[in-house]
Amino acid sequence: MNYSSIVKLLTEHGIASASNDAAELISHFNGKPPSWCLANRDQNLPPEITKAAERLAAGTPLQYITGRAWFMGDKYFVSPDVLIPQPDTEHLAEAALKHLKPGMRLLDLCTGSGCIIISVLKRVIASGTGVELSAPALAVARRNAEIHKIGSRLELTQADALDSDIVTKLVSEADVIVSNPPYINTDVIDTLSPQVRSEPRLALDGGPDGMRFYNRFITDYTRLMKPGAVMLLEVGYDQAERVRALCGSAGVSCAFIKDYSGIDRVAVVG
Protein backbone atom coordinates (compact mmCIF):
# COMPACT_ATOMS: atom_id res chain seq x y z
CA MET A 1 0.00 0.00 0.00
CA ASN A 2 1.19 3.54 -0.77
CA TYR A 3 -0.02 7.08 -0.09
CA SER A 4 -2.32 7.11 -3.12
CA SER A 5 -3.97 3.83 -2.22
CA ILE A 6 -4.42 4.90 1.41
CA VAL A 7 -6.18 8.08 0.27
CA LYS A 8 -8.42 5.96 -1.97
CA LEU A 9 -9.20 3.57 0.90
CA LEU A 10 -10.09 6.37 3.31
CA THR A 11 -12.20 8.15 0.70
CA GLU A 12 -14.14 4.96 0.01
CA HIS A 13 -14.91 4.76 3.73
CA GLY A 14 -16.35 8.26 3.79
CA ILE A 15 -13.47 10.10 5.43
CA ALA A 16 -13.69 13.65 4.06
CA SER A 17 -10.16 14.62 5.10
CA ALA A 18 -8.63 11.53 3.48
CA SER A 19 -5.60 13.26 1.94
CA ASN A 20 -4.61 15.10 5.10
CA ASP A 21 -5.28 12.12 7.36
CA ALA A 22 -3.25 9.80 5.16
CA ALA A 23 -0.32 12.22 5.13
CA GLU A 24 -0.43 12.70 8.91
CA LEU A 25 -0.67 8.96 9.49
CA ILE A 26 2.33 8.22 7.29
CA SER A 27 4.30 11.11 8.78
CA HIS A 28 3.68 9.75 12.27
CA PHE A 29 5.19 6.38 11.41
CA ASN A 30 8.06 7.31 9.08
CA GLY A 31 9.06 10.62 10.66
CA LYS A 32 8.93 12.47 7.33
CA PRO A 33 7.03 15.74 6.87
CA PRO A 34 3.54 15.37 5.36
CA SER A 35 4.80 16.97 2.13
CA TRP A 36 6.96 13.87 1.61
CA CYS A 37 3.81 11.93 0.74
CA LEU A 38 3.04 14.03 -2.34
CA ALA A 39 6.53 13.57 -3.73
CA ASN A 40 6.48 9.84 -2.96
CA ARG A 41 2.81 9.01 -3.46
CA ASP A 42 3.49 5.68 -5.18
CA GLN A 43 6.22 4.40 -2.87
CA ASN A 44 5.30 1.20 -1.06
CA LEU A 45 4.92 1.62 2.68
CA PRO A 46 5.73 -0.79 5.53
CA PRO A 47 3.07 -3.19 6.86
CA GLU A 48 2.63 -1.23 10.10
CA ILE A 49 1.38 1.77 8.11
CA THR A 50 -0.97 -0.44 6.09
CA LYS A 51 -2.44 -1.86 9.30
CA ALA A 52 -2.84 1.61 10.78
CA ALA A 53 -4.57 2.81 7.60
CA GLU A 54 -7.01 -0.10 7.82
CA ARG A 55 -7.80 0.82 11.44
CA LEU A 56 -8.39 4.41 10.38
CA ALA A 57 -10.70 3.32 7.57
CA ALA A 58 -12.62 1.10 10.00
CA GLY A 59 -13.42 4.07 12.22
CA THR A 60 -10.59 4.34 14.75
CA PRO A 61 -9.89 8.08 15.16
CA LEU A 62 -6.54 9.22 13.78
CA GLN A 63 -5.70 10.78 17.14
CA TYR A 64 -5.95 7.43 18.90
CA ILE A 65 -3.64 5.84 16.35
CA THR A 66 -1.00 8.57 16.57
CA GLY A 67 -1.54 9.28 20.28
CA ARG A 68 -1.63 13.02 19.72
CA ALA A 69 -4.15 15.80 19.27
CA TRP A 70 -3.93 19.57 18.99
CA PHE A 71 -5.68 22.05 21.29
CA MET A 72 -5.13 25.81 21.55
CA GLY A 73 -2.11 25.41 19.27
CA ASP A 74 -0.43 22.87 21.54
CA LYS A 75 0.06 19.12 21.15
CA TYR A 76 -1.47 16.77 23.73
CA PHE A 77 -1.14 13.07 24.34
CA VAL A 78 -4.43 11.20 23.94
CA SER A 79 -5.54 7.59 24.24
CA PRO A 80 -8.90 5.79 23.94
CA ASP A 81 -9.34 6.54 27.65
CA VAL A 82 -10.10 10.22 26.97
CA LEU A 83 -12.17 12.37 24.66
CA ILE A 84 -10.33 13.77 21.67
CA PRO A 85 -9.93 17.56 22.10
CA GLN A 86 -12.15 19.45 19.66
CA PRO A 87 -11.80 22.95 18.17
CA ASP A 88 -15.16 24.09 19.56
CA THR A 89 -13.95 23.36 23.10
CA GLU A 90 -11.27 26.02 22.60
CA HIS A 91 -14.05 28.56 23.18
CA LEU A 92 -14.37 27.16 26.71
CA ALA A 93 -10.64 27.57 27.36
CA GLU A 94 -10.67 31.08 25.88
CA ALA A 95 -13.58 32.05 28.13
CA ALA A 96 -11.63 30.80 31.14
CA LEU A 97 -8.66 32.92 30.08
CA LYS A 98 -10.86 36.02 30.11
CA HIS A 99 -12.07 35.37 33.65
CA LEU A 100 -9.01 33.88 35.35
CA LYS A 101 -6.53 36.37 36.77
CA PRO A 102 -3.06 35.68 38.22
CA GLY A 103 -3.29 34.14 41.66
CA MET A 104 -6.85 32.87 41.22
CA ARG A 105 -7.98 29.23 41.50
CA LEU A 106 -9.37 27.27 38.55
CA LEU A 107 -11.44 24.08 38.84
CA ASP A 108 -11.94 21.74 35.88
CA LEU A 109 -14.67 19.14 36.41
CA CYS A 110 -14.48 16.04 34.16
CA THR A 111 -10.96 17.02 33.12
CA GLY A 112 -10.27 14.04 30.82
CA SER A 113 -6.99 14.62 29.01
CA GLY A 114 -6.47 17.82 31.00
CA CYS A 115 -6.19 19.90 27.84
CA ILE A 116 -8.56 22.64 29.05
CA ILE A 117 -7.02 23.35 32.45
CA ILE A 118 -3.46 22.84 31.21
CA SER A 119 -3.91 25.21 28.27
CA VAL A 120 -5.27 27.88 30.62
CA LEU A 121 -2.58 27.45 33.30
CA LYS A 122 0.10 27.66 30.59
CA ARG A 123 -1.11 31.18 29.89
CA VAL A 124 -2.07 32.48 33.34
CA ILE A 125 0.06 32.19 36.49
CA ALA A 126 -2.71 30.73 38.59
CA SER A 127 -3.37 27.40 40.30
CA GLY A 128 -6.00 24.79 39.64
CA THR A 129 -7.46 21.35 40.22
CA GLY A 130 -8.65 18.88 37.61
CA VAL A 131 -11.25 16.35 38.76
CA GLU A 132 -11.76 13.09 36.88
CA LEU A 133 -13.57 9.87 37.82
CA SER A 134 -11.65 7.61 35.41
CA ALA A 135 -8.23 6.52 36.67
CA PRO A 136 -6.90 5.82 33.13
CA ALA A 137 -8.05 9.26 31.98
CA LEU A 138 -6.39 10.85 35.00
CA ALA A 139 -3.14 9.13 34.04
CA VAL A 140 -3.38 10.79 30.61
CA ALA A 141 -3.94 14.18 32.25
CA ARG A 142 -0.90 13.66 34.48
CA ARG A 143 1.22 12.82 31.46
CA ASN A 144 0.06 15.98 29.70
CA ALA A 145 0.78 18.08 32.79
CA GLU A 146 4.33 16.73 32.76
CA ILE A 147 4.72 17.33 29.01
CA HIS A 148 3.62 20.95 29.40
CA LYS A 149 5.59 21.49 32.62
CA ILE A 150 2.72 22.88 34.68
CA GLY A 151 4.31 21.66 37.91
CA SER A 152 2.83 22.16 41.35
CA ARG A 153 0.26 24.73 40.18
CA LEU A 154 -1.98 21.87 39.02
CA GLU A 155 -3.48 19.17 41.22
CA LEU A 156 -5.25 16.21 39.64
CA THR A 157 -7.82 14.43 41.77
CA GLN A 158 -9.82 11.25 41.18
CA ALA A 159 -13.40 11.92 42.25
CA ASP A 160 -16.98 11.81 40.98
CA ALA A 161 -17.89 15.29 39.75
CA LEU A 162 -21.53 14.58 40.58
CA ASP A 163 -21.25 13.32 44.13
CA SER A 164 -18.19 13.97 46.23
CA ASP A 165 -17.36 15.93 49.38
CA ILE A 166 -14.02 16.70 47.75
CA VAL A 167 -15.74 18.32 44.78
CA THR A 168 -18.13 20.45 46.83
CA LYS A 169 -15.16 21.83 48.78
CA LEU A 170 -13.26 22.56 45.57
CA VAL A 171 -16.32 24.31 44.10
CA SER A 172 -16.55 26.59 47.13
CA GLU A 173 -12.88 27.58 46.79
CA ALA A 174 -12.71 28.17 43.02
CA ASP A 175 -12.77 31.53 41.28
CA VAL A 176 -13.44 29.99 37.87
CA ILE A 177 -15.06 26.61 37.24
CA VAL A 178 -14.91 25.00 33.80
CA SER A 179 -16.37 21.76 32.51
CA ASN A 180 -16.92 19.94 29.26
CA PRO A 181 -19.13 17.27 30.84
CA PRO A 182 -20.78 14.25 29.24
CA TYR A 183 -23.87 15.68 27.50
CA ILE A 184 -25.08 13.18 24.90
CA ASN A 185 -28.40 11.43 25.49
CA THR A 186 -27.81 7.81 26.48
CA ASP A 187 -29.95 6.36 23.68
CA VAL A 188 -28.28 8.52 21.02
CA ILE A 189 -24.72 7.32 21.56
CA ASP A 190 -25.09 4.05 19.64
CA THR A 191 -26.42 5.95 16.60
CA LEU A 192 -23.33 8.14 16.27
CA SER A 193 -20.36 7.66 13.95
CA PRO A 194 -17.81 4.91 14.61
CA GLN A 195 -15.28 7.61 15.42
CA VAL A 196 -17.42 9.05 18.22
CA ARG A 197 -18.38 5.60 19.49
CA SER A 198 -14.65 4.89 19.84
CA GLU A 199 -14.45 7.51 22.57
CA PRO A 200 -15.04 6.51 26.21
CA ARG A 201 -18.74 6.13 26.94
CA LEU A 202 -18.21 7.51 30.43
CA ALA A 203 -17.16 10.81 28.84
CA LEU A 204 -20.14 10.90 26.45
CA ASP A 205 -23.17 9.72 28.42
CA GLY A 206 -25.09 12.61 29.94
CA GLY A 207 -28.06 10.51 31.03
CA PRO A 208 -31.47 9.99 29.38
CA ASP A 209 -31.83 13.67 28.42
CA GLY A 210 -28.14 14.62 28.34
CA MET A 211 -28.68 17.04 31.23
CA ARG A 212 -27.48 15.01 34.23
CA PHE A 213 -24.32 17.02 34.83
CA TYR A 214 -25.90 20.42 34.13
CA ASN A 215 -28.68 19.67 36.61
CA ARG A 216 -26.15 18.96 39.36
CA PHE A 217 -23.72 21.73 38.51
CA ILE A 218 -26.27 24.51 38.07
CA THR A 219 -28.90 23.52 40.64
CA ASP A 220 -26.51 22.59 43.44
CA TYR A 221 -22.97 23.82 42.80
CA THR A 222 -23.85 27.42 41.96
CA ARG A 223 -25.18 27.77 45.54
CA LEU A 224 -21.73 26.84 46.84
CA MET A 225 -19.76 29.27 44.68
CA LYS A 226 -18.14 32.22 46.39
CA PRO A 227 -19.18 35.77 45.41
CA GLY A 228 -17.75 36.78 42.06
CA ALA A 229 -17.00 33.23 40.94
CA VAL A 230 -18.09 32.08 37.49
CA MET A 231 -18.95 28.69 36.01
CA LEU A 232 -18.23 27.99 32.33
CA LEU A 233 -19.89 24.96 30.73
CA GLU A 234 -19.69 23.52 27.24
CA VAL A 235 -23.17 22.52 26.08
CA GLY A 236 -24.55 20.40 23.24
CA TYR A 237 -25.80 21.98 20.02
CA ASP A 238 -29.46 21.72 21.12
CA GLN A 239 -29.13 22.29 24.86
CA ALA A 240 -28.72 26.05 25.26
CA GLU A 241 -32.36 26.83 25.97
CA ARG A 242 -32.68 24.02 28.50
CA VAL A 243 -29.52 25.21 30.25
CA ARG A 244 -30.86 28.77 30.22
CA ALA A 245 -34.13 27.60 31.79
CA LEU A 246 -32.21 25.63 34.41
CA CYS A 247 -30.23 28.73 35.32
CA GLY A 248 -33.47 30.70 35.61
CA SER A 249 -34.90 28.13 38.00
CA ALA A 250 -31.68 28.24 40.04
CA GLY A 251 -31.75 32.03 40.16
CA VAL A 252 -28.39 32.54 38.47
CA SER A 253 -27.46 34.56 35.41
CA CYS A 254 -26.62 32.85 32.14
CA ALA A 255 -25.07 34.07 28.90
CA PHE A 256 -23.73 32.12 25.93
CA ILE A 257 -20.64 32.18 23.74
CA LYS A 258 -21.10 30.91 20.20
CA ASP A 259 -18.85 28.37 18.50
CA TYR A 260 -17.32 28.54 15.02
CA SER A 261 -20.68 27.51 13.52
CA GLY A 262 -22.64 30.22 15.33
CA ILE A 263 -24.17 27.77 17.82
CA ASP A 264 -24.45 28.63 21.52
CA ARG A 265 -21.63 26.45 22.87
CA VAL A 266 -20.37 27.83 26.19
CA ALA A 267 -22.68 28.80 29.04
CA VAL A 268 -21.35 31.55 31.29
CA VAL A 269 -23.12 30.94 34.59
CA GLY A 270 -22.95 33.05 37.70
Regions found by a protein language model. Give the residues of each.
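Residue-level signal for inorganic ion chemistry
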Residues: L25, G59, T89, I116, ...
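Conserved AdoMet
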Residues: S27-K98
